[in-house]
Amino acid sequence: MLIIAGLGNPGGKYAGNRHNIGFMAVDAIHRRHSFSPWSKKFRAEIAEGELGGEKVLLIKPQTFMNLSGEAVGEAMRFYKLQPADLVAIYDELDLPAGKARLKTGGGHGGHNGIKSLDAHCGKEYRRLRLGIGHPGIKEMVQNHVLGDFAKADKAWLEPLLDTLADNADMLVRNEDSQLMNKIALALGGKAEEEKPRKDNKTTEKKPAGQSHIHQARNHNQPKVLTTGPMADILKKMFGNKGE
């Protein structure tokens, strides 16, 4: 079983905030796939369904952002799950708008929702960070995060959420790099280059049944001198062996 937790603040007042992009992502997955209607449990809104043949619980904590870990931790204990069974989706100031990054573990980066998850759920869970951009000035961060997305943001926000929802089964299959490439391409970026495969270098095959030493002895042996001054000296020293 996998828990996909979208982080945000509850209530209509915060629904369109940049800080609520985690809620938006989970809502998009819920709409795209066959999940149960939202219900209330664990101080959260939850919905059950399947992705990629595995049972999945979508969860939106209703505790407000700073206490998100209390709700998610309660659900994890109920289902006896480990940090590896959790994916958290949340906003990231330090990523340009529309960029996404997915990794296991790491720091909280000053995100209070992640601080709470770390405290209540452990740290080795997967973190899907969705970039909302930085306003450029520290004093503007709070208004930026708790401000609504602008109309112009729809140009990247909608394809980001749609692509994530369309390929949510990749989260279950741990196809993290493939999912990141899908999102990058949908936003007009470039997929990350795959690591080059090692060339299958052709090596000289050794004859069957022969050791490396035996091969070396039979390979390009120097010619024995039979004539000339050096040959005469060798004959005087060692005699005519082998003749």
From Swiss-Prot:
GO biological process: protein quality control for misfolded or incompletely synthesized proteins; rescue of stalled ribosome
Reactions the enzyme catalyzes: an N-acyl-L-alpha-aminoacyl-tRNA + H2O = an N-acyl-L-amino acid + a tRNA + H(+)
Pfam family, one: Pept_tRNA_hydro
Site positions per UniProt: Stabilizes the basic form of H active site to accept a proton: 91
EC number(s) given by UniProt: 3.1.1.29
Protein name stated in the entry: Peptidyl-tRNA hydrolase
Signal peptide: none
InterPro entries: Pept_tRNA_hydro (IPR001328), Pept_tRNA_hydro_CS (IPR018171), Pept_tRNA_hydro_sf (IPR036416)
Entry function: Hydrolyzes ribosome-free peptidyl-tRNAs (with 1 or more amino acids incorporated), which drop off the ribosome during protein synthesis, or as a result of ribosome stalling.
Renumbered residue ranges of the record's region Disordered: 188-243
Keywords for this protein: Cytoplasm, Hydrolase, RNA-binding, tRNA-binding
Record's keyword annotation contains Cytoplasm: yes
Gene Ontology CC annotations of this record: cytoplasm
Listed HAMAP family: Pept_tRNA_hydro_bact (MF_00083)
Enzyme class, broadest EC rank: hydrolase
NCBIfam families xref list: pth
PANTHER family assigned: PEPTIDYL-TRNA HYDROLASE
Record family assignment: Belongs to the PTH family.
Site (Discriminates between blocked and unblocked aminoacyl-tRNA): 9
MF GO annotations: peptidyl-tRNA hydrolase activity; tRNA binding
Subunit structure: Monomer.
Protein's cellular compartments: Cytoplasm
